[in-house]
Amino acid sequence: MKRIALSTLSLALLGVTGVAHAQSSVTLYGLIDESIQYVHNTVDSAGQNKNLVAMFAGNLQGDRFGLKGTEDLGGGLKAIFQLENGFDVNSGKLGQGGRMFGRQAFVGLTGDQWGTVTLGRQYDPLVDLVQPLTADNYFGSTFTTPGDVDNNDNSSRTNNAIKYTSPVWGGFQFEGMYALGGVAGATGSGQTWSGAATYATGPFSVAAGYFRADNGNTLASRTAAGSVGWNGSTSDGTFDNQVNGAYAAAKSIGIASVALQYVAGPFTANLRYSNAQYKPDANSGFGSTEKYNIGGAYLGYQATPAMLVGVGYIYTKASGDSSATYHQVSLGGDYNLSKRTDIYLVGAYQHASGQQRTSAGTLVDAGAAIGSYSYNSASSSQEMVSLGIRHKF
């Protein structure tokens, strides 16, 4: 990272005894992840399966640049901030719905003894503490849940959030977050709350947490540009493909997640389980709670100091409103050319069965849709391969 130091200020005041000191720093940082991608079985504008060869940005990590900084306030207390932009390197367009700082934007206070409090647009505690113990942390979107129905790929951020992060006490750490809906006369409308904890000892780590987001109390709160959907919440929606696209007008989303990881020499193994529930009300357009039970496993091998290879498997079962089942196998390799630049090759195969609901409200045979991508297949299977480069600065 390149640092822009707003370095130590030493002010000698004429006629005043003593010197005032303030330690400050600001860091400019970023990341560009670009690839050539091949997809077998993705629908075209006519709804027919075709093969696709295209440029795709953000396989392992989303493209970004940002500023983060600290100011020493004395007595172990610091002020902190972070402003992080997401963008598409292929088009130069802003990500996260065109927001200038759509990935993160917060300010807060931190102390070694009591922890950190931050306010603004942030990741929830499951993203901070549970996701690092899953396959997505190593190989990104190709290794994540179909449709990202449990936000394992960090597709959702939360606005208006107040978050507390504890210090690490003997390997234990926890986070709690609450986001205000900001609706006059309806305090809970649009609110989000979440909590998670993690514990690490030696080669073993475990984490668990819960997330709940409300989509507003009225039909008007869920309607934008004439479309009813996930518009009334402080948290972003994750409805980019056919796996869960029919549930964008849900009253609420609840996600419970647990993960554990073990590191033995060059091997890293982890397991995870999530339960995501999309609950309806009279304004939702579907009648029964849609439930997704997700189980995932990952094995990584650090073949050399520069080379990581990994394999992942995810089982996703829908119930309640639909009956779809998704089996997904992913393979990946990542090679470091330097401390800041790496090249990678990732691929996945997915098979779908049962039925899923469409955005039009009908039940149809389930179609495959790998990871958190927006590639919908008109058939039960899909394959994908991406060859890319990532540079951090």
Spans of features found by a protein language model:
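Detector for outer-membrane/organellar transmembrane beta-barrel domains
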Residues: 196-332, 348
